From Swiss-Prot:
Gene name per UniProt: recR
SMART domains to which the protein is assigned, alphabetical: TOPRIM
Summary of the function given for this chain in its UniProt record: May play a role in DNA repair. It seems to be involved in an RecBC-independent recombinational process of DNA repair. It may act with RecF and RecO.
Transmembrane segments: none
Residue span, Toprim domain: 81-176
Name the record gives this protein: Recombination protein RecR
Family that this chain belongs to: Belongs to the RecR family.
Keywords, comma-separated and alphabetical: DNA damage, DNA recombination, DNA repair, Metal-binding, Zinc, Zinc-finger
Gene Ontology MF term list: DNA binding; zinc ion binding
Renumbered zinc finger spans (C4-type): 58-73
Entry's Gene Ontology BP terms: DNA recombination; DNA repair
């Protein structure tokens, strides 16, 4: 029995790095891109290459940006006194869709997960602490997910910032326990922000 070409194996292995994509899904995607949608494959490869080339992390909020400081952080209409901490860019996007928050953000790009080797240092919490204690921020709103890891992250951040005299609040549990902001409707997120509590 002959094995597939090594370039095909490499493509399938590369697609498996995506979240939720197992070997069968990766194989189906590879075959589809190569056989049915070569233009789409070329566009995907080009867009990914371009994004890797031009995107970096904003120096203030840690979100993806093409500039040293992203447009949101540079916007003088945003309230610099409140800093909302989220796990991922998708969480920030969901909060923005509610149109109920006008402060600034800090994107952790993950959450504490000791079993996966992600501790405070790996998450870069020292950058968050520096940002939250820069003199502009009056309140930090913790909007991490209501999962075990999200709760542990919120608790750790609250402890670190509270020890430095920073006012810390937590979004309300209008977001379902075990739920993730990315999969929550905007009305629920808006209510959770309005009904946040001290943490």
């Amino acid at each position: 029995m002959s094995s597939p070409p090594s370039s095909l194996d490499e493509l399938i292995a590369a697609l498996r790095c995506l979240p939720g994509v197992g070997p069968k899904s990766a194989q189906r995607m590879a075959y589809h891109l190569l056989q049915r949608d070569q233009r789409g494959a070329a566009r995907l490869a080009g867009a990914l290459g371009h994004a890797l080339e031009v995107l970096r992390h904003c120096q203030r909020c840690n979100n993806f940006s093409e500039e040293a400081v992203c447009q949101r952080c540079a916007n003088p209409r945003r309230d610099p006194a409140t800093l909302c901490v989220v796990e991922m860019p998708a969480d920030l996007a969901m909060i923005e869709q509610t149109q109920s928050y006008n402060g600034l953000y800090y994107v952790l790009m993950g959450r504490l997960s000791p079993l996966d080797g992600v501790g405070p240092r790996e998450l870069g919490l020292e950058r968050l602490i520096a940002r939250a204690t820069d003199g502009e921020v009056k309140e930090v709103i913790l909007a991490t997910n209501f999962t075990n890891e999200g709760e542990a992250t919120a608790h750790t951040v609250a402890t670190l910032l509270g020890a430095r005299g920073v006012k810390v609040s937590r979004i309300s549990r209008g977001v379902p326990v075990g739920g993730e902001l990315e999969h929550t409707d905007t009305g629920t997120i808006a209510q959770a922000l309005v009904e946040r509590r001290a943490f």
